[in-house]
């Protein structure tokens, strides 16, 4: 009996072909070899094999899929993932990105994986790049042996951590540390049953509120879920903030500042990614990002000190129309 392949699922967060997440393997993986799976669908059996004569990079271990479900812009059937407060106050980008993952965990596809006794799934958002996937085989074996439920492959907070050996061999030296409130859905490996249990608990509790990361950490504690974070994960999974920053500017109303922002995103991707990160929604009418918050504080400053410069008010107005 053939071994069950581990699904590698690409979740689109920007307009980009799924194969660009794996740039060095176009001879094995191209866009036609990615199955598109969406809501109420299961994986077709024909994609069980990637045909290559030799497999030094382990690509026969996996079946490659692009998840196209969970689009909250299509309809409102994903509102049950969020509380009434979050549906009003959480930003559109936050809800959109979280809904994609929760809809995947809650899909018929994941139920089918559980029925087929598939233990783990690798999930990668398409603003990441993985140039060498040979680390996945020993990592999957190690997290099975160590009973790890979730391996997060993007670090949110760096610093001194108590690290534990995960994989030590001639090719890889990988360590992990226990996750807390530093939750990221950018790139991770998750046990199928764990994903099903988490999304079931979220729905039963009335949906996520604004504190998504705190709630996920709370659920993990209550359900005794072992989530580890890969130390120095950028060595294996490279997140490109430029792609998201450019995407945010491209989806803004075309104006002078959006054009300036697109250019700045190429030169200062990390800074522009941070500045364009949405913080809160104003009752679902519009989202306020970091730049928008700075503009609001600047307006308050000008009102308090009764600034009468027409140029400053004009420039502030252009920022308001562009970023708020």
From Swiss-Prot:
Disulfide bonds: none annotated. Its main location: virion. Induction: Expressed in the late phase of the viral replicative cycle. It holds the Pfam family Pox_P35. One of its GO terms (biological process) is virion attachment to host cell. It is found in: Virion membrane. The chain crosses the membrane at residues 285-305. Does not contain disulfide bonds. Keywords: Host-virus interaction, Late protein, Membrane, Transmembrane, Transmembrane helix, Viral attachment to host cell, Viral envelope protein, Virion, Virus entry into host cell. GO terms for cellular component: membrane; viral envelope; virion membrane. It is a single-pass membrane protein. Belongs to the orthopoxvirus OPG108 family. Envelope protein that binds to heparan sulfate on the cell surface and might provide virion attachment to target cell. This is Envelope protein OPG108. It comes from Monkeypox virus. The lineage of its organism: Viruses, Varidnaviria, Bamfordvirae, Nucleocytoviricota, Pokkesviricetes.
